[in-house]
Amino acid sequence: HRCTFCIIPFARGNNRSLAMGAIADQVRALVAKGYREVVLTGVDICSYGTDLPGNPTLGHLVRRLLKAVPELERLRLSSLDPAAMDDELFRALAEEARLMPHLHLSLQAMDDMVLKRMKRRHSRDDAYKVAERARALRPDLVLGADLIAGFPTETQAMHDNTLAAVRDLDLVHLHVFPYSERDGTPAARMPTVDVPERKARAAELRDAGAANLARFLATSIGQTVPVLIERDAMG
């Protein structure tokens, strides 16, 4: 898939999936070295398997890894395209306790016209439905998202739609980027938003995410849950 703002496909070419057995071997080796959590990552992990025999999906890979490496304590997923999450992945989310209750969605925007001009495959309503379905299966689920602020042609009203969705969906972990032109991409030829306005809109989105995170942390006070300490530092 090629979004209008993204230069990555031009640099990296088409997706190339590792065989499930090879991934399981890598995870098994990491666990043997003492790693307790593995994060599956890639340019577009929801497209996993489209170039492999039998077309296994990301959901099938998750199931295979958790079965093949029972010693793995925690499996986490990196950024997910909400238009390409398969049914097996949702079933794994509901049934596999070792799959972390955290989904990071590659939303980029939450206004339908902006999404269309980005050439994204999901609509605003699609994203809401994905969040609703996932939370129904996993009530303790935490959602994050990637967002681009000030995409070409984005009006204040379009930005406000994205800002409202951050609050509606209670997105607590945001990766927000002011739009940055990439030569050779279709978006670079579109009418632009002034750079200071892009930065201001990005700050608004980050502030909304920070407020959501503060509320989430407040609800966690008094709970006892297993955690993974990642570094020797406070905070």
Where does each model-flagged region fall?
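Conserved SAM/AdoMet-binding glycine-rich loop
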Residues: 32-157
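Short, ordered loop/turn segments at secondary-structure junctions
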Residues: 11, 43-45, 179
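Terminal RNA-binding accessory module
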Residues: 181, 189-235
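Conserved, mostly hydrophobic/aromatic
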Residues: 3, 23, 40, 77, ...
